[in-house]
Each structure stands twice: as C-alpha cells, then as structure tokens.
C-alpha cells in the first residue's frame, strides 16, 4: 500500500483497507469462518478450504481495490495455507500463509499462491543453516584444513589448498556442501572467505618466523567475493600485513565465476598478476564454454574436477576425457592440478 498511498493519498488508502475488511467480514459470516486484520496492508481469514472459494475471495478483494486505483492496476496478492483437519490450528499456519504470500507478490501473472511444503522446508533450512553457522563462527568452530598438492613424479608436497571446515558441537565435521550454498546466497561467504584468507596468511607468517618450511597455499575466491569486494586489493593488503611474498598465496577462482562474471574475473586476474599473485581456474570442465574460455582467459594453472578422475581400472570415457584435457593443457603450456587422485 505504500506506493498506492503515495499516488492516491493516505485517506484513500485507508478507504481501500476498510472496503477489503468489509468484504472479508461478509465472507467470514457466509463461510462461518474468522477474519482479521494483521496490520499495515495484511489481512487474514480462516475458512473451510476449497480451491474455487479461494479464487472467489481473491476476485472480490480485487474488485474492492479496483474501485480506488483509477485503472492503474494495483493487484492484491494472496497466500493460502491449507490446514490438516486433524491438526491443531497454530500460529505456524499464519507464518506459512505469509511465507506463501511472498511468492504470490512476486508473481505478476498468478496472484494467488498455495502453500508448498518443500519450499517452506528449504527456506527454513536456509535460515537454520545461517543461524547455526553464525553461532559456530562466533564460537570459533569454523576453521580450515590444508589439503596437500603432491608432485606425481617426486612425491614431494609442492603446495596446498585451504579448505573450510565447520566443526559441529559434537566434534564432527560438517561438509561444505551443506552450508556453502546458503552462505553464497546470503553474502556471508565474503566474511567467511576473508576470515580464512587471513588465517592462512597468519599461519604462513608463523611458520616462516619459526624457520619452518612453507609451500604456496591456494585460497578459494567465490563469484560473490568478486562482486562484493576488491579481491586483488585485499590480497595485496594481507601480503603486506604479514610480509609474505605473493607467490605463497595462490588465488583459486571457480570456472562458474569465469563464465558468469567474465569481465569482472578478467579484471581481477589482471590486477592479481600485477601484484605478483598467480591464479588457478578451479573445477575446470564443470562449467559451460570451457574451450572458448581457455582461449580468452588469463590463468596460470587449471585444476581438473575430481568427477573426471577415472575409477580403479576404468580405461573408458573418463580416462580418455582426462587424457585429452591434459594434452590440451600441455599444448597451452598450462600446469595442471588434478583433484581426487588420492
């Protein structure tokens, strides 16, 4: 109603709400239900559920609004949550109806939405994951492990990759697959990645100060990081803060970031190279337009995704594909890291 009030005035907006309330009161009496006003521009009604009745209610509410909008087309939306007759009516039903109404508001073609349990469960799981992760982050239960990169000819550890790990309250490790998508969607992954980057830089500095051997460590950069912050500047600041040569901090960017944000990634890789950092294309072969991208992108190393690694004794397509990829990389003078060979 905010936009309606700006165009037609608060008084006219109040008349719309009064007319909608009258319509719902009439339906309440006719259906032996209960109607109410939630505040702002939200109403609710509890009646026996029938699909035809739902659309009849919507049409009557729409007609009440249409009398006031001068043909501009302010379309109300309605979220419907059917209640199991064997279950007690609780505030949970209201929350589900409000959740469903958000979908209706975003659908300019179909303004009536029926509750979908799977959508609600996904949304609930999303917020639960974020909440629990933030608690774990505050409690110091977010850390990283270093996965070694080994020279296949000599067996020497020549590098490592910093992999984020969430330690559960019981000490178990929670797979990144279960929480990284939610962090990327919410944007919290930027906070996480900066935390991991700084942790690795501090660890490298500590080993150098103790006279211990160090190897370059790969730091993962997501598409969200690229859009949300100046990654090259941040990496340069970390290297300066911990007095590290940039060769010790390798920057891994997923192939999906290359394909989805090619201009931003091109600029980032150029800035990183200017500052002395090397760049890896992670998950090579899992995105789109891989061959065309290799021709244009300025990358130092490619990492083949573990899905291409042949199983024991597999000399079929997987082996042929990975052989072709290695030959292609060699012809382009690109070093290759293969995941999952262990």
Q: At which residue positions do the language-model features occur?
A:
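Conserved long alpha-helical elements within nucleotide-processing catalytic cores of c-di-GMP signaling
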Residues: 1-25, 36-40, 44, 52-55, ...
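Alpha-helical scaffold within the catalytic cores of cyclic-nucleotide enzymes
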Residues: 20-25, 53-71, 95-98, 196-206
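A short glycine-enriched loop-to-beta-strand structural element that forms part of the catalytic core
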Residues: 37-46, 70-104, 110-116, 215-222
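C-di-GMP signaling machinery
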Residues: 90, 99-145, 153, 182-189, ...
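Active-site core of bacterial EAL-family cyclic-dinucleotide phosphodiesterase domains
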Residues: 125-182, 220, 281, 338
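The catalytic core of metal-dependent phosphodiesterases that act on cyclic dinucleotides
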Residues: 236-312, 326-342
């Amino acid at each position: 109603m905010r936009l309606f009030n700006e165009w037609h005035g608060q008084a006219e907006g109040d008349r719309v709400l009064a007319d909608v309330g009258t319509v719902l009161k009439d339906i309440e009496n006719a259906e032996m239900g209960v109607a109410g006003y939630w505040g702002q521009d939200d109403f609710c009604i509890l009646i026996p559920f029938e699909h035809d009745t739902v659309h009849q209610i919507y049409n009557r509410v729409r007609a009440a609004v249409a009398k006031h909008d001068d043909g501009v087309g302010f379309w109300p939306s309605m979220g419907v949550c059917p209640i199991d007759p064997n279950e007690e009516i609780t505030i949970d039903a209201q929350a589900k109806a409000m959740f469903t109404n958000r979908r209706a508001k975003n659908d300019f073609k179909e303004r009536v939405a029926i509750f979908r349990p799977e959508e609600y469960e996904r949304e609930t799981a999303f917020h639960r994951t974020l909440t629990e992760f933030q608690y774990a982050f505050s409690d110091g239960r977010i850390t990283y492990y270093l996965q070694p990169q080994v020279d296949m000819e000599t067996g020497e550890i020549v590098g490592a990759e910093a992999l984020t790990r969430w330690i559960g309250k019981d000490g178990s490790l929670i797979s990144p697959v279960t929480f990284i998508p939610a962090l990327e969607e919410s944007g919290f992954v930027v906070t996480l990645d900066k935390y991991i980057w700084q942790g690795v830089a501090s660890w490298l500095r500590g080993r150098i100060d103790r006279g211990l051997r160090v190897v370059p460590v790969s730091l993962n950069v997501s598409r969200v990081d690229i859009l949300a912050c100046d990654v090259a500047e941040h990496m340069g600041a970390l290297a300066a803060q911990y007095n590290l040569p940039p060769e010790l901090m390798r920057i891994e960017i997923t192939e999906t970031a290359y394909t989805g944000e090619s201009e931003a990634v091109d600029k980032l890789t150029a800035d990183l190279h200017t500052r002395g950092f090397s760049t890896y294309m992670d998950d090579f072969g899992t995105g789109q337009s891989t061959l065309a991208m290799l021709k244009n992108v300025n990358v130092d190393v490619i990492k083949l995704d573990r899905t291409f690694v042949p199983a024991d004794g597999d000399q079929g397509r997987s082996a042929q594909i990975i052989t072709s990829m290695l030959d292609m990389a060699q012809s382009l003078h690109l070093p290759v890291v293969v995941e999952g060979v262990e």
